[in-house]
Each structure stands twice: as structure tokens, then as C-alpha cells.
Amino acid sequence: MTSLKRSQTERPVTADRASVVSTDGAPKVHTDDFYMRRFRSQNGSLGSSVMAAVGPPRSEGPHHITSTPGVPKMGVRARIADWPPRKENVKESSRSSQEIETSSCLESLSSKGSPVSQGSSVSLNSNDSAMLKSIQNTLKNKTGPAESMDSRFLMPEAYPSSPRKALRRIRQRSNSDITISELDVDSFDECISPTYKSGPSLHREYGSTSSIDKQGTSGDSFFDLLKGYKDDRSDRGPTPTKLSDFLITGGGKGSGFSLDVIDGPISQRENLRLFKEREKPLKRRSKSETGDSSIFRKLRNAKGEELGKSSDLEDNRSEDSVRPWTCPKCFAHYDVQSILFDLNEAIMNRHNVIKRRNTTTGASAAAVASLVSGPLSHSASFSSPMGSTEDLNSKGSLGMDQGDDKSNELVMSCPYFRNEIGGEGERKISLSKSNSGSFSGCESTSFESALSSHCTNAGVAVLEVPKESLMLHLDRVKRYTVEHVDLGAYYYRKFFYQKEHWNYFGADENLGPVAVSIRREKPEDMKENGSPYNYRIIFRTSELMTLRGSVLEDAIPSTAKHSTARGLPLKEVLEHVIPELNVQCLRLAFNTPKVTEQLMKLDEQGLNYQQKVGIMYCKAGQSTEEEMYNNESAGPAFEEFLQLLGERVRLKGFEKYRAQLDTKTDSTGTHSLYTTYKDYEIMFHVSTMLPYTPNNKQQLLRKRHIGNDIVTIVFQEPGAQPFSPKNIRSHFQHVFVIVRAHNPCTESVCYSVAVTRSRDVPSFGPPIPKGVTFPKSNVFRDFLLAKVINAENAAHKSEKFRAMATRTRQEYLKDLAEKNVTNTPIDPSGKFPFISLASKKKEKSKPYPGAELSSMGAIVWAVRAKDYNKAMEFDCLLGISSEFIVLIEQETKSVAFNCSCRDVIGWTSSDTSLKIFYERGECVSVESFISGEDIKEIVRRLQFVSKGCESVEMTLRRNGLGQLGFHVNYEGIVADVEPYGYAWQAGLRQGSRLVEICKVAVATLSHEQMIDLLRTSVTVKVVIIPPHDDCTPRRSCSETYRMPVMEYQMNEGISYEFKFPFRNNNKWQRNASKGAHSPQVPSQLQSPMTSRLNAGKGDGKMPPPERAANIPRSISSDGRPLERRLSPGSDIYVTVSSMALARSQCRNSPSNLSSSSETGSGGGTYRQKSMPEGFGVSRRSPASIDRQNTQSDISGSGKSTPSWQRSEDSLADQMEPTCHLPAVSKVLPAFRESPSGRLMRQDPVVHLSPNKQGHSDSHYSSHSSSNTLSSNASSAHSDEKWYDGDRTESDLNSYNYLQGTSADSGIDTASYGPSHGSTASLGASTSSPRSGPGKEKVAPLWHSSSEVLSLADRTLETEGHGMDRKAESSLSLDIHSKSQGGSSPLSRENSTFSINDAASHTSTMSSRHSASPVVFSSARSSPKEELHPTASSQLAPSFSSSSSSSSGPRTFYPRQGATSKYLIGWKKPEGTINSVGFMDTRKRHQSDGNEIAHTRLRASTRDLQASPKPTSKSTIEEDLKKLIDLESPTPESQKNFKFHALSSPQSPFPTTPTSRRALHRTLSDESIYSSQREHFFTSRASLLDQALPNDVLFSSTYPSLPKSLPLRRPSYTLGMKSLHGEFSASDSSLTDIQETRRQPIPDPGLMPLPDAASDLDWSNLVDAAKAYEVQRASFFAASDENHRPLSAASNSDQLEEQALVQMKSYSSKDPSPTLASKVDQLEGMLKMLREDLKKEKEDKAQLQAEVEHLREDNLRLQEESQNASDKLKKFTEWVFNTIDMS
């Protein structure tokens, strides 16, 4: 036989392809016989031994092996074909050192004859032939037919010298050219066999010219196969390793081999197995041949080999499933990517060619798919530029990706791409409102996560946050978060650079080049925790993931002593943290600046703050790449867009980031578009600004730049065809952001956005809201720039760019490890004298148990988390650092959940599972499946890093009335507990936070649902988070400091501007849904400063809210009145919230949702109070506080103005607003969903609309009866119904607040309703804003009742101020009720004001916050309402009975008793309007008299309730007398009382109150405001509150004692207060005051009450009250007829006269004028303060401008100085030179 002729370096595997001659020496040429194919491996390497001896290599034609190729080589084919140097050029190179070393090995396979091209032949001996056959069989069996599919065509190219390369015809470059039908059945079966699948797939990776996939797997293991056949030449051990490495490199670089993505993981495992089989023996041999004379080294090696053997067995057992590497628990990770660091994966990937693949990616992949999916019509539009369609052949035939089937008018679904068309949002795995039933169905609802201070999952990077940076993290409310940035890359720069540390480099046998940086430090904050020293470590491999973090010295077992100045041996530290690392390979690096700079460059390789973005211009009717590139110039719509996006810059001489554009010769155009965003510089490659080539269809000058941009913006004019990436041919364009203009070049121009990204690019934010358009604004610009930046950052995580970055990183590391190291090992004490062998080895001390739990970085546990949204579980890593809790999904290697540790409020743990509650009760669940101790460790860690605590589960029993005995507000916080009741005995305490009710998470429930669940469940099992030691509820940092997230109500068709505020860059405007009356009301964001100011008012003289002793029921747990909460979706909500915010001091609490935070108080303040400001420990009445703070209340939280302007005005002065988007409140869903933007019933908010009031009243009253205490229910429950009809905006506003109220667990919510109602009523009477013809927006009833009162008092401002108007209406309502009130009890009820209502009203008023409640008697309350009140009053008694024993403070919270069911403001059925107690201002603290009186009244009420008597009237009278006595010191209070009494004079309290349940005890309950009220409001409210017995906490059922019920003063005032939300009394009072100032209407004055000593005739009281009401009504009517609701003019005169007479007779003394004067004074002061603030701001702006000018001048002067000095220097030199010359 003739021998094979081949180069020494050509692998023998290709022998089967060489020509074979017969035994007689004559060469035989075989054509490509179909029947012979089965004997060869498909498309590949070795055939059978028979074929080796019989057949020639397969060829496309009958060309002889020595002939030239039959197909001409042109273009890329020619380059590829000639790539391996030809024989002539390589003859010497084949003798390179590496190849020479392996020559003998190859000679054993083939004779040393000349290459085939020389034509000489040498015969093979029998041994050679047998060995070849054996090799062939082995290869066939081991690598499988699949592995060799491409090898016979591709393998020759993998070698530097291929003797037959030049002579061999170009084969198909991929098996995709070979259809499966060309293979016979046998070979096909082999291809589809499992064995085949484990190797490379049948088809090649799609690729274009430079991305041909060559499979070199067989080359990787070739020398392993040869080892079995080389009997001699044992001295050549190292050679195969080097050659193998060489071949791997060649195959990688030359061929870009890759495996199909589909089979990638299997191939990785197979490669890992082959690598280990080959590498392990080499490792052992190299160890034994190192020649190291150290005994310790040898001993260590022996031990290592034993360990290696055992690990080899493990590897063999798990070769199909390589377990992820787990870092020791003692290691605290610095950032997220460190947690994802996987040492096993690094080992595997180092030898896996998959990272070297360079395949068709980006838009080209889509183009490829479009070709494969249809018949291969090589149309010009889709063919590749060189006409090589095979470049576009993809894996299409085998499981081609079909896209995501998401399309719209902007973008089409496309293979290999994923579309984002709006509404996608971020993944949510926690159990929260967003994924509960009420929200899940609303696709139109979208949360603008970018506005939330909650970091997005993709935006989480650094986990170890220094204490000094914590406050910075609180201020995360930046509009958009930059995502997918490895900010941990600064770890070396921050903690190592220019500090004492050690760098070690080396080449590990498994990991390749590695670099380790280690530093020992003594952190200041660690002293408290025990371990004084900490080791910071960075471990770098060729993989992009880097291990960064720290380990406490006490957590490291060591032979040395801990906590000494010398420290532990670094070797022991590294061996403990990274046991897989061979530390002996490490050598100390040079301590030079070059090394540190190179390390920083290596670490920060992935950080790039300069980005280039392409912009393609698509005109109407266009869709293809050529059409877009051939648009020579920009149209007006495009120019308008470009002007918004960036700055047009002249390229010539441009010195900033130029993005490969020519800035010298204008060869790439004269101008371009440039901009900056945050820290990023962005240069746009605008297609119309790049050079246009008239005769070049492809416009290569343009495509050269845009085609190489990763992110491209496609701007579409109206009428453009939907965009599809398949029309683009580019390997780099991975993300397209499609922007379509609507109504371009008009004032209403707006843009819609869609995104399509390559499938391996992770999703990125900010999310696109569904069905919205963005108006032209800076907000849209920021949104788009953030989207573009995040798109590029995310694209760098795709496989293509990661592979490129990995290669770069490997080269950096290699250079460092080879050229920048000393000979110093990591353990310099390496060799000891032999004598040391005899000594006993020193044992390592055990680490301090649990030491790592005090680390600042993230400690990690492997757990299984529950995805509540998808109802599935997934494996993940739980990381808990000092700042963050993160769950990282192992499969996707992405963060699935994150929250701040300061947001954790508690947890429920068992042996194997843990449920963590955070923020407002949302929760995540994890299970431990590795160690039973994991959960205990996690709990200890949570105790260390958070302020939460273990939850408590308890079963609650009902009392005889079916009541549970506690009040819960809408946040799930227990506001009051009946002393010694069943709930109290079970351990429930005020401030406890319910997180689960009957296994249902409270976070998923609305307040109404919560109450229903408590009321209807047979067995009530609750899980609570116990309060702090001072009884304040546990709150998350978000609730306290963070602006609430506003939930945008997106109805399709509404322009984006109405959904997001773009009017100001700083503010987000929200408008209600389409139906909303004032869609454009700008919600003003309150600047933090403003909020602080507002908050400050309350704070100034009060203890911190946390200290507040009581949580008003009506107030949200954060202290904001519940009713204040509006649905964020509604206009009113926005307005109200803004107003409320303006008033509320810190309404940030989630409860504040409603507060859009326009008003500074709510939104602006980051500090949330657990209680209303008014409720400080001192429990001062809010009113007083308001007053006290009035002067300081610059923000004018008291503004009652409904319009945003008001808040804006006050806020304007303040600093830039923070996002006030109200947090999405539980109330929101209903309101938001309702098309009109009305509050939905969902929140038991009382709707004010007068029409409904009556009905809802009754309904409500029943609700109210269901006090939370009674556990029955939330008054709110029926709230909505009250106003289902039309609600005035004010109603809505109040409703929102009411909703908050309802949160009170139904306590007094009804009252709230009325409060709102009253306000609404005002509006209604005025004309219920909705019902009224104008449906003018009633000022949001946000104003505290006092405000409303004050409004009423004042003269209601103008129609413009809806609030004022509402207030007026309220007044009018009152008047009406007066006029009508004379008649029956019903009328009295009408007056709705029945004391009960009044009381509640007052409460509300007192809370002041509920301005709306103030006048809320519903002007139109239907007769039914009136009737219902009676029922409610009945309820009231029970309430009172339940709370009869409660002391003043307890009374502070009105019970939800039915009594207050009708809010004071409810109208009579006839439509009479009862004025609400305008005592909002009552000062609770005022001489404490009010409180005492109130308490007593309540007590008496309770007593009455306890012993119901048929003659409730007398009882009530007595109670009233008592109240009057108590309040006598405050004439105003007396007046208030009188007023209330008047409001419902005829009917016994029970009747009237019945209509409403007492409001929650809010500040008003405290009577806090009554005395403080500047106006009659004060006294009335407080008296009323006191008078109302509704204070009873627990009546859940309507008490059957209708008459005896002494109405507790309803929380009506509370309701008002609630409206304000957290507003402290000061807020409301301030607001009222301000309004009062605004409205200079003279106050008719408080109705004088008789002295305490004087006898009171009940009938007289009633008459007086009526008369007074009439008088006031007429008074207000006169001041503003427009606002006067329904007062009967005919009767007004008479009534007025009567009232005057009665007032004279009854008033023992005139109202004190001092109050009014004080108010005026305060108002004047406030005005001055505002002016001063405005001036200060102007001055500040001027100063800033001056400073800027000075800086510019300074720079200019410096430059001039420098120039002058340079000139002087030159002159001096010249002078000296001339002197020297002379």
C-alpha cells in the first residue's frame, strides 16, 4: 500500500480523505458515489476503516485529488480557502517548536514521505494501517457521527498547514447546505440518535462571511485518542498538551466554532467531560514532573491527587449535570454579579468553544429566518451583500425561533426578536396588590416604576452600601433608573486603589490566568459587631463574572491567632474562600502604577459612558432598510424630533465623544446630533446627516455607521409601515426603538414608542405604559434616552458581546499573569527544615459561629422561591446585605426580586420555609432545601439588618354582638383595641399590623375586602406584626421617607400627557380618566422642601410621630386620615391628592397614595408619621398645632384651593418637587378603574354626591355598624354606594379621603363619608359638582373640615377654587338643612347633621383635614338618608357602650357607630342641608377641656348606650349639658355644640347619627381642632365630637338602642382629617386659616352657647341651632349666591331673625374676637413668610447665577493668566537667549 502524504502537522484524522491507492501502487480515484456515503461519517471526519483503504475522499465531482478545485474561489470563499497557509509557505512554519515536538507522534501514523502535492507515494506498513483503522473506529465510536458532520470540510482549515488545502475543492461550509435527504436512512438515524445530539447538531450555526462555524471538538480530544496507540515515545508527554492547546486556539480563532444554542448546554457538558478526561492525567503527571524538591509540596500534591481522584468520581457521576458552584457562606458579596460568579462554569467555559462562536446575530438573524421560513428565493432584498445565501442559512430548519407574536402599528413580530409594545412591566414574584385579582385584570393600569424609589430588578448592582451612602439611596426617586450596569466594577478603585493591598497573578490549571486582589482592613462600623478586621477579596478569571466581597477575620479557620496586627496567612484566607483555586500557582504582582491601572482597566472593562446610537428615518409607506437609508433629507416631523432629542453640533473641531465620526475633514457629514443624560454622552448617527450617495442604493457610507450601532432609533412618520428587523441586515443592530410621531408640527404633537430586541438581550426599562402617547416634553426625552442607554447596556449581556468581551478580558489577564509578576509565592514561608515534619501539624482554630451574619455585604443561601404571579417555584439565591434583600434566579441569572432591608417589617418562619413581609405587607416566600439551619440563619441575619420582627398568629373570638373588639385602618394597622376584650386577651395591641387574615394577605385586599373578611369569617385567624415597644406600628422606610408611587390610570386613547405629567420636568401631572372633569389638572409635585416645611409645622412642637400614642382610626396608619385617600386614577384624586399633599405634612406614607403629593405636605415630606401630627405624645389638638405652625407653614399646607395651582403656588416656592405620585393605594383600584374616575365602591369611602348620600347613608350606616372593632366591617364599605350616583369632584376627593377612612376598618368611616359628603354636599348644594350644572370641581374636600369651615366662613373664594366652592356648598348645605330642618326628626336627620353626624362631622372637622367634611351635610341627602341616620344612631349607642369605659384618649377615636353614620353634613331627605360641624378647628389640647369634655361625653354616651333608655332624648340632653359644662371655658366650643345640636335638633341623636357612623376618631375626635378653629368651626366641631357618643369603638352591629344612643361625636371631622390623610391638625388648620385669609368673608360668628350653669332646654337648643344654621346659611348665601346650595330664600329671613333673637337670648357671652384677630394675624404672617420665601428664592437664583458667572470669569482669568505666564516665559527665554547670543 502507498502511504498517505501529509504534512507533519496535519491531523491524521483526515487520512480518510486522502487519496488511497490500490495495493499495486496505482492510485484509484473514486467519484462521489451515493452508495458509498453510508460508509463515511456524514459531512465529516473519519469513515470506516474499509473506506480508509478503499475510497477516495468525497468530492463534489470527479476531480482527482491532485487536480485543482473545480469551483473557482472568489471573494470570501477564496480567503477562507486559502486561510491555512499553503504548503510552500508553511513548510518551515510546520517545523515550529510546537509542531516539531509532535512530529514523531504524527510520524507514527504516517510515513515521512513528501506531501501529496509532490506526487510521491510511500506505502503504509501493516502496523500503520492497523493503527489507522483503530483510530478511525475509536473516533467514530467516541465522537459519534454527528461530531464529524463538518469535520471533513472544516478540519483542514483548523491547521496551519494543510497539504491538500490548496488542491481540495471548496466544500460546503456548513452542513446546512447538505439536506437531510442526501443522507441515507442509516446515517440519518445516527444523526437523530441521542448520541448524535450530545455532539454538534446536524446543522451548523448560521453565519455570514466571517462567522463560519467550524467544529473542532474532535481536534480537542484527538491527542487523547492517540495516547492509547503510542507504545514508544513516552518521553513526549508534554507535547500533546501543547499541541492540543495550539489546536484549540487554532480551531477557535480560525473557525469560530460554535454549537447550536439549542444543544449548547449538552455540548458544554460533553466538552467538560472530554476536557476532564484529558486534563486530569496531564495535571497529575505535571505535578509529578515538576521537579519540586519540597517535601511539603509533594505531600500536598499527594493529598491533592487523592482529593482530585474523589472529585473526578463526582464529576463522572454528575457529568450531565454540573452543579453550580456555591461560595462559602462566610463570604459577603459586594454586588449582584459576584453572587452569580460560578467557578465550575468558569472551568467549563474555558475549554468550551461555545464562547468562541461568531454567528449570525442581531437583525441578520431575523433576515436569515425570513429566508429559511419560506422557499429559498434569493431575492435581492434579502440576499446577503456578497450573494452568499449560505451566510444567512440559519438553524431555521431545526426549531427556528418564531418570535413572540406581539405586534402593533409600530412593529411586527419577528423571528429571533422580542417586542415590547406597552404594558409589559417588570416581573413581580411577591404577593402584592399588583398581582391580586383586582389589579391583574386591568391591563390598562400601569405603574411607572421608574418614578418609584424602589429600585428596579435590573437596576440593582451594588449590595454593600456604606452607612454614609444610605441617605443617597433614599433619594432614588430619580425619574429613570439606569439598568444593567456593573457598578460593582468600581470595587477595586474604591477599596483597593492607593490603599495597602496585595495583588497575586497566576495561571491555574483549570481556570487559566487568574488575578487576586486582597486587602485587610479595620472598618469603623465593625467594632461594634465584634470582628475588628475584614478581608476584602477580588478574584478574577477569564469569565466576565468576578468574585467581589469580603470575609470577616473571625469567620476564617486559621492556624494563626485572630485579631492580631499581623493578620492571618493570606493563603489560608484564599483557601477558605476559594478552595478550588490552586494557590501555589499565584505569584505576587509588581507593586507599580502600571499594574494597578491595568487591574482597574480590567475590572471596569464593561463600563462605558459613551454610546453611539443610530437613527433611521422612515417616511410614510416605507419599511425596508434601503428605503430608509435613501431618504436624502429630514422632513419637518423628523427635524422636530431631533431638536427635542439632542443638540445639533458641528463635527469639524468637535472635541467631545465623536463616535467614529470625522471631526477633521467632514467626510462623514458636517453636523451630527449629540446629547448627554446623567453620566452618559450620546452621539447619534442620524441617517439624514450622514453623507448621501446618489447612485448607491445601499448607501454604504450611512450603513457603515448605523449598521455597526447596537441600538437604533427608527423614527416613523405618520403612515409608515410597521417596522420589522428582518428588513435589516446587520450583525450588530440588536435593539430597535421605534418612535412614531402623531400630529407632528402641531401643539398636540405626541409620540408612541415600541421596542424590539434580539431574543438574547434581556428586558430593560423604563417600561412602556400601555396605550399611551408621550407629549413633546423633556420627560419624554428623558424616557427615550434612558430606554436607549439601558438598551445598549442590556445588549452587552447578549451572547455575542459577552464572547467578545471575554476574549478581551482573557488577553488582559494573560498579559498580567505573564509579564507583571515576581517570583514570590503567596506563602513565602514555603519550605521548612525537615525537622518540622516531626512536629505535630498545628490545627486550625474554628471560626466564630455566625460571625458572617454581621457582615455588610450580601450573605447568600440557596433557596427555592415562590412566584405568586405565575404560581410556580424556582431555584434561586437569596442574598441579604446591610441594605438589600435580593432573590436571583439561577436559571436566568437575573434578579427576580429586591427590596431594601429597611422596608422589611416582619417575617413568618418555620423549619423549612420563610415568608418575608415588606413595605405595606407585601411578602415573598422562600423554602430551604439544603440545610435545616438555613432558615434560622436567615432569620438571624434579618434581625441584624432590619427592624422587623417575627410575626404572631392568633385566633380571634367574637363577643356577644359578633364583634372582634378592635379597629383596623385601611393599611391593616390596628388603630384601637377594646380593653380586656377577646382581641386584647389574645394579645392584639394598638399599632399591630395585620398582614394576613384567614390566610389571605392583607396586601392583596382593599380595606373593604379586609373588613368583610373580618366580619364574615366564622373563625378569624390573623397574622400580625407586633408594634414597636412604644406601640407605634412597624413601618417600612418607603412608607416613611419615600414618595408614594402614583398609579397611572391609562385608558386607551388618553394622551400620555394626561397620564403622566409632562408639563414640568419636575412634576408628573396626572389626570383622571377620560370621564374626569379636569383631566388636565396638573398634579403638582411637592418639592421635598415643601413637604418638609409642611411636615415641619406639625413637627415643630410635637414629638415624633413614632411616639404617637394613638393611631386614629380614621387616620391611615401613617397618621393620614383614611378618607383622604383617593384613587390615583382620578382627576380628583390627583387634585385632591395634590391639595392634600400641600396640606399634609408627610403624607408619603403609602396610605398617602391619594396624596399625589402635589401638596408639599403629603408628597414632599419624606418623613412619615405613624400618627397625624396632631397626635403627638402630647396629643395636642391638630388645630393648635396648625396654628402654631401656621407661621412656619410656608408651603401653605392649609390651602383649601382645590386647584393644583394653589398647591402649586405654595409649592412653587419650594424646591423642586419630588414625585408626588401618590402611592398606589388600596383605594385606587376602584377609583382608578371607574371610567369616570370616581372612587369605586371598593374603598369604603363615603361618596359625597348628595344624591347618593341618602341611600348610601343607610347603606353606609349598616356598614358603619360594622366597625372593625366590631370587626364587622368597614363603614367605608358602603361609602361608595353613598355616592355611586354622581359625585362631585369634591365628593371624589373626599371619597378618596374617605377611602382612607374606610381604612379605619370601617370605624366611623360613615362619618367620613358624610364629611366628604358634606363637602360634596356643599358642592352638591352648590350643585353637587357632578350633579350641579357646572359640575364644577368642588374643591377637593381635602381641606380639613376646618378648612371647609373656614372657607365657608371666609367667603368662599371664587368659583375658580373648587375647594372654596365646596366649602361654601357645605355651608350652604348647612343652611339648607337649617331651613328645612325645622320639621320632622327626619328633617333633623336631614340636617343630617344630627349630632351624631355633626359629631362625626366635627371629628372630621377637627381633623381639619377634612375640609370637605366640613360642610358636607349632603345637600341632597335623600329622605332615606335621614331615616337611615336613625338606624345609625342606634348603632352609635352600641358603640358607645363598647367604648364606654374608654378614656379620653380612646375616645379620641370615634367609633364607627352607626350614630355617625350620617355625617353631619348629610342633607335631609328633602334636600335640606345641615351644616356640618365646622369645628374642625376644635383644639383638642385646648385647655384639654375639649378632650375631657369629649371623653366625658363619650363616656356618658357609652353609659347611655350601655343602659339604653326609651327616652334617649333626655339622655342626650344630659350628655350635651355635660359637654357644655366641660366646654364652657371655650365659648366657641359651646357654640359648636349648639351648632351641632341645632343641626339635628329635632331628631334624637340616634336618628341623625344613625345616618352616619361615627367617623374614626381622628384628630377631630380629639376635639383637637374645635377650640383651635379660628372660626366657629372650632367650637362646633369639638363640641359635636364630644357630644357624639359614636366614639364607641367596637360596635360592629348596629346597636338596637336607637334612642339611647348618645351620639358620639362622629368622626366626621375625622373623615375630614382623613381626607387630609396624614395631615396633622396643623395641616388642616393651616389650610383653613389660609383659606380664611383668602376668603375675606366675615364670619357670622360662632353661635354663642349658654353658660354651663344655665339650664338648657332641649327644644331651645334645637331651635337655636336651626336658627343659627339658617342665619349662617343666609349669610354665606349672601356672600356668594353661586355657592349657596339649596337654602330656601323665602324662609331665610324669618329664620335669620329668629336665630338672631335666639342667639341673643342664649348666648351668655359674645364670641371672643381674639380668635378672628389671631387668625388674621397668622394669615398676615403667613403671607409675609411666603413673600419672604419667594424673595429668598429669587435671591438664591440670582446668587447662583452670579456664582456661575464668577466661575466662568474665574476660568477665563485662569486661562488668561496661564497664557500670560506662557508668554512671559517665552519672552524671558527670548531675552536670555538674546543676551547669551550677544
From Swiss-Prot:
Entry keyword set: Coiled coil, Cytoplasm, Cytoskeleton, GTPase activation, Methylation, Phosphoprotein, Synapse, Synaptosome, Ubl conjugation
Coiled-coil annotated spans: 1713-1773
PANTHER family from the UniProt entry: RAP GTPASE-ACTIVATING PROTEIN (PTHR15711), SIGNAL-INDUCED PROLIFERATION-ASSOCIATED 1-LIKE PROTEIN 1 (PTHR15711:SF10)
Organism: Mus musculus (Mouse)
Protein name: Signal-induced proliferation-associated 1-like protein 1
Domain PDZ: 953-1031
PTM annotation, UniProt: Ubiquitinated and degraded by the SCF(BTRC) following phosphorylation by PLK2. Phosphorylated at Ser-1328 by CDK5, creating a docking site for the POLO box domains of PLK2. Subsequently, PLK2 binds and phosphorylates SIPA1L1, leading to ubiquitination and degradation by the proteasome.
Signal peptide: none
Residues that bear Phosphoserine: 162, 187, 193, 208, 255, 288, 1078, 1087, 1116, 1127, 1149, 1170, 1181, 1234, 1249, 1305, 1328, 1345, 1369-1370, 1391, 1410, 1412, 1507, 1528, 1533, 1544, 1547, 1564, 1567, 1582, 1624, 1626, 1629, 1687, 1690, 1707-1708, 1712
Function: Stimulates the GTPase activity of RAP2A. Promotes reorganization of the actin cytoskeleton and recruits DLG4 to F-actin. Contributes to the regulation of dendritic spine morphogenesis.
One Pfam family in the UniProt entry: SPAR_C
